Amino acid sequence: MSDLEEVVEEYEEEQEAEEAAAEEEDWREDEDEQEAGEEEEAGGGREAEAETEETQAEEDGQEEEDKEDEDGPVEESKPKPRPFMPNLVPPKIPDGERVDFDDIHRKRMEKDLNELQTLIEAHFENRKKEEEELVSLKDRIEKRRADAEQLRIRAEREKERQNRLAEERARREEEESRRKAEDEARKKKALSNMMHFGGYIQKQAQTERKSGKRQTEREKKKKILAERRKVLAIDHLNEDQLREKAKELWQSIYNLEAEKFDLQEKFKQQKYEINVLRNRINDNQKVSKTRGKAKVTGRWK
């Protein structure tokens, strides 16, 4: 049983006790008044009966006296009749229906209790409905908040993707422009080298003559390898130092392979540019020869 029901029961018991005491006092006062009224009515009836008897006796006495006066002495010898006095019974006052105040109080208390119970049930039903509505409202709010969070995350991801695409596009454009600039620079450099290629060969021959004996390609390779290759001294190294040395050697090999690949690509590009320039030179020479022949024929004419 909850605290509210206990308080309600205590209040109802107090109200019942007070109403029972008040009704009992009222009932006693009504009984006292009713008894007093009955006694007064009974006393009044007796007085009225006595008065009627007295008046009747006086009337009878008066009649007898009148008769005696009329009849004279002859009638004096006759016995006087005894007057008949009927027993006058006072009217009986009906008691009426007796009111059961306990039953009325009990019914009233039952009615109040039923009304209070219905009010309590209605209150709890309304409270339950309000709690259910509050829970559903909280669920809707959480759902909307989760949907808004998902939309925000999607918008952020889409924005990041657009930014990455823009950066990638800008980087590609920059690389393309840089590659074109490098190609143009290499072409110009190759063209200048082709123009000075003959002088370079002559200078190289002169330097070789001055140095004396000409080195072969194999000797050049051995010399370069001897300069690059270092003595590997690992006898005095521990495990960690050996691991670091291995990482260093691996990095050097990686760098050499990268340089080799770059040199190969550079050699291919230079070879391609040389072929292109050579073809251009041949085309220019053919055009210049045809123009010179035309001028000569024209001059002889």
UniProtKB/Swiss-Prot annotation:
Q: Where is this region: Disordered?
A: 1-99, 125-223
Q: Phosphoprotein: present as a keyword of the record?
A: yes
Question: Which example biological process does GO assign this protein?
Answer: muscle filament sliding
InterPro entries reported for this sequence: TNNT, Troponin, Troponin_sf
In which residue ranges is the amino acid composition biased (Pro residues)?
Answer: 82-93
Q: In which tissues is it expressed?
A: The major isoform in adult heart is CTNT4.
Processing and modification events after translation: Phosphorylation at Thr-216 by PRKCA induces significant reduction in myofilament calcium sensitivity and actomyosin ATPase activity.
Asked if Phosphoprotein is a keyword of the record, the answer is yes
What are the protein's GO molecular function terms? actin binding; tropomyosin binding; troponin C binding; troponin I binding
Task: Locate the compositionally biased regions of type Acidic residues.
Answer: 1-42, 50-74
Query: Which parts of the sequence carry Phosphothreonine?
Result: T207, T216, T297
Sorted alphabetically, the Gene Ontology cellular component annotations on this record are: striated muscle thin filament; troponin complex
Q: Which residues carry this modification: Phosphoserine?
A: S2, S211
Record PANTHER family: TROPONIN T (PTHR11521), TROPONIN T, CARDIAC MUSCLE (PTHR11521:SF5)
**Record function comment:** Troponin T is the tropomyosin-binding subunit of troponin, the thin filament regulatory complex which confers calcium-sensitivity to striated muscle actomyosin ATPase activity.
Q: State the family it belongs to.
A: Belongs to the troponin T family.
Subunit relationships: Binds with troponins I and C to make the thin-filament regulatory complex, troponin.
Q: What is this protein called?
A: Troponin T, cardiac muscle
Q: Which organism is it from?
A: Oryctolagus cuniculus (Rabbit)
What lineage is on file?
Eukaryota, Metazoa, Chordata, Craniata, Vertebrata
